[in-house]
Amino acid sequence: MALSSKTLKSTLFFLSIIFLCFSLILAHGGIDDGDEEEETNQPPPATGTTTVVNLRSKSLVLVKIYCIIILFFSTFLAGVSPYFYRWNESFLLLGTQFSGGIFLATALIHFLSDANETFRGLKHKEYPYAFMLAAAGYCLTMLADVAVAFVAAGSNNNHVGASVGESREDDDVAVKEEGRREIKSGVDVSQALIRTSGFGDTALLIFALCFHSIFEGIAIGLSDTKSDAWRNLWTISLHKVFAAVAMGIALLKLIPKRPFFLTVVYSFAFGISSPIGVGIGIGINATSQGAGGDWTYAISMGLACGVFVYVAVNHLISKGYKPREECYFDKPIYKFIAVFLGVALLSVVMIWD
């Protein structure tokens, strides 16, 4: 019974992913979706830009509002789901690697190419601004992670120092052994969640998750066509669902008292972060148009590329989800296949871009 229940949950989740993929392909393949806007807004060559898109289009803004709703509820429900049932470890392991491949391909094939093309349209061909901004986005994201890790490590040392004089030697050994087992679960930020015991420390690390998510949401808000918005939604929501599930599992281990209430609070914070980023992106588009809008879009896409590459490589692919129990698929070859399938899927979808 338990096995069939797990299989049913995994099957339903896979069907959801297939539905999202189908919606994404329709968004790219339909000539009436984003192409109509692009065709009706083709600029004269004298403007110095390759395309001029109506970023204030009601239909485009409406699609982004749909993205906000879908992002929030998918992330929030995924975050609280571990409280009600246990997820399949193999599914989370391979799903995280798959989303890492999607993220990596999105950064390099979509964001970086769009930023570079826009800079070329702005007559800036001598210097590789797009690649420089991608490197800057990578470094900024790494700096944020380093800052959070530094604060969390210092707080963790304080907790350990305070407990040494109050615990017996046998208790210390038991705590260390239990810690080793618990640290094996969750995505890397969730691992840090498990190492902390204070409300402030946990809130800080949730803030780190939200920091990444806001920048990811900005990528949706800055989309200049409806097809771009749907594609970015699919890419980001896929990653956030797995991250939210891992976060929920870590919180249940971390908070033995009132776990449901705090899990709901943290899941809400994590779920609302990307919609906030979408709103910021919509606001940027509403205040910039023409050459100024092109500059804003190119710079933002360049930085977003760096953020996505960092999240894909350091959070999803290299560390990923660590099963709490021995898992048959926890092998490099299966992880490679999952990442490769993610890259291949996004590469095929981009044919219709």
From Swiss-Prot:
It is a multi-pass membrane protein. Keywords: Cell membrane, Ion transport, Membrane, Signal, Transmembrane, Transmembrane helix, Transport, Zinc, Zinc transport. Residues 30-59, 112-130, 223-235, 285-296, 353 are extracellular. One of its GO terms (molecular function) is metal ion transmembrane transporter activity. Disulfide bonds: none annotated. Induction: In roots by zinc and copper starvation. Its main location: membrane. The chain crosses the membrane at residues 60-80, 91-111, 131-151, 202-222, 236-256, 264-284, 297-317, 332-352. Zinc uptake is highly pH-dependent and no uptake is seen at pH levels below 5.0. Inhibited by copper and cadmium ions. Mediates zinc uptake. May also transport copper and cadmium ions. Belongs to the ZIP transporter (TC 2.A.5) family. This is Zinc transporter 2.
